Design a protein with these regions (language model features):
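FAD-site-proximal beta/loop scaffold in flavoenzymes
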Residues: 117-141, 220-225, 229-288
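FAD-binding core/adjacent interface of flavoenzyme oxidoreductases
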Residues: 2-5, 69-144, 227
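Beta1-alpha1 glycine-rich phosphate/pyrophosphate-binding loop at the start
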Residues: 2-70, 156-182
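A Rossmann-like FAD-binding core segment of flavoenzymes
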Residues: 70-79, 83, 94, 164-255, ...
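A conserved FAD-binding loop/helix module that cradles the flavin
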Residues: 239, 247, 271-321
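Conserved N-terminal Rossmann-fold NAD(P)-binding element of oxidoreductases
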Residues: 11-12, 101, 148-149
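C-terminal auxiliary extensions adjacent to catalytic cores
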Residues: 2, 322-391
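Glycine-rich, N-terminal phosphate-binding loop of Rossmann-like dinucleotide-binding domains
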Residues: 13, 103-104, 110, 217, ...
Length: 391
């Protein structure tokens, strides 16, 4: 580190990385570099709308990033932590004093499913959503579409298509909307039933073919277009770089989001997990960990002790087409309570949230340090740590 201009590199320009890079500007004496493989910001929460042809999922970085953030369009292929160096796909090398690891998540590998990579359309990245959009636009209006995935991504994709009058089937490996309470799940099921969407719960897809999907019992169902929303995985960059990861490949950090291996590496977003506080892959988690990761780096630079990351969840909201939505209220630990909201007002709230996410990132770029979030009490965080130790 130089005395005048420490260099902080942020890997990944999604919700977490963009938030972190902007927030770092609170220290006016550092150089900030954001590395992202695309020239545009991807609003991932709108990918299902983009794929269906009902929305836009990209935005220019220029108004999104603060003036002191330098964008490098490239991808990291290896982190050399002892040398504090990042090797990029282009062949270039970046030196850093601190690194924020925020590369996000990608499609679930779903190892062992024949035909998945060849014939299915994943819905976790812009490029795959773009291919799906072309397939939908060039297909007949009555072709059979199969969406695989019982979570929010699968439900929102299936409902967006059903709202357009498309012929949709939703295959759920377990129950529909497993993170929601029973009343909210019934609301979602009733919405699909009114639109004649065939929802197959506790049913696994074992093979994807060009014109069908094969279920675990051997049944082959016709499917001209198969959309895969069966979960998310993370890139193997941390593991390949010799850093400690969990069973899913997520970078392991302590409760300040600092890597268990290297105090110069701090994590944020989907590709990271703490040893003390379990978090859900989500935009909300990404934004908050991005802000907290920046705060941790700023504390390190200032020579002060970073504060433990604390987060309280309040709910999960999913859209059902353009005119309806379901908001599942949760406890601070993200477990569902019995209450939920639905209807047009909830749909308006969902759209308000979707619009507010990029607005919040732009605001952080203009006013670094402005973002705040709901936090759990220290006692609750300590309880989470105790539960991890006991397990």
């Amino acid at each position: 580190m130089t005395d005048q201009h420490p260099h902080v590199v942020v890997l990944g320009g999604g919700y977490a990385g963009t938030m972190a890079a902007n927030r770092l500007q609170q220290n006016t004496n550092i150089d900030i570099t954001l590395v992202n493989p695309r020239e545009e910001f991807v609003h991932r929460l709108r990918l299902h709308q983009f794929a269906a042809g009902t929305g836009i999922a990209t935005a220019e970085y220029a108004p999104m990033l603060g003036k002191r953030v330098r964008l490098v369009v490239d991808s990291a292929v290896r982190i050399d932590a002892p040398a504090r160096m990042i090797r990029l796909e282009s062949g270039d090398v970046l030196d850093y004093d601190y690194l924020i690891y925020a590369i996000g998540s990608t499609d679930s590998t779903a190892a062992g499913i024949p035909g998945l990579s060849e014939f299915a359309y994943p819905l976790s990245e812009f490029e795959s959503a773009q291919r799906l959009r072309v397939a939908l636009e060039t297909s007949g209006p009555d072709v059979q579409i199969t969406v695989v995935g019982a979570g929010l991504t699968g439900i929102e994709m299936a409902s967006e298509l059903a709202d357009l009058g498309r012929n949709v089937r939703l295959v759920c490996g377990g129950q529909l909307a497993p993170t929601f309470g029973a009343p909210a799940r019934r609301t979602i099921a009733q919405w699909f039933a009114r639109r004649r969407v065939d929802v197959l719960e506790n049913t696994s897809v074992t093979e994807v073919r060009p014109d069908s999907v094969v279920l675990a019992d051997g049944t082959a169902l016709s499917s001209a277009i198969t959309v895969w929303a069966g979960g998310f995985g993370v890139p193997a960059l941390a593991a390949h770089s010799g850093l400690s990861v969990d069973a899913d490949g997520r970078l392991l950090t302590d409760d300040t989001l600092t890597s268990m291996d290297d105090g110069r590496i701090v994590g944020a977003g989907d590709a990271v997990t703490t040893t003390s506080l379990p978090t859900r892959m989500s935009c909300y988690t990404a934004n908050t960990t991005g802000a907290a990761a920046a705060d941790t780096v700023l504390s390190h630079l200032a020579g002060t002790e970073p504060a433990p990351f604390r987060l309280a969840y309040v709910g999960q909201c999913l859209s059902l087409g353009r005119g309806n939505a379901v908001l599942q209220f949760t406890r601070k630990d993200d477990s569902p309570v019995g209450a939920h909201a639905r209807g047009r007002l909830t749909a308006w709230f969902k759209e308000f949230v979707l619009t507010g996410v990029p607005w919040g990132l732009r605001r952080e770029g203009r006013k670094p340090g402005a973002s705040v979030w709901f936090k759990s009490r220290p006692a609750q965080a300590a309880q989470h740590r105790a539960e991890v130790v006991q397990s």
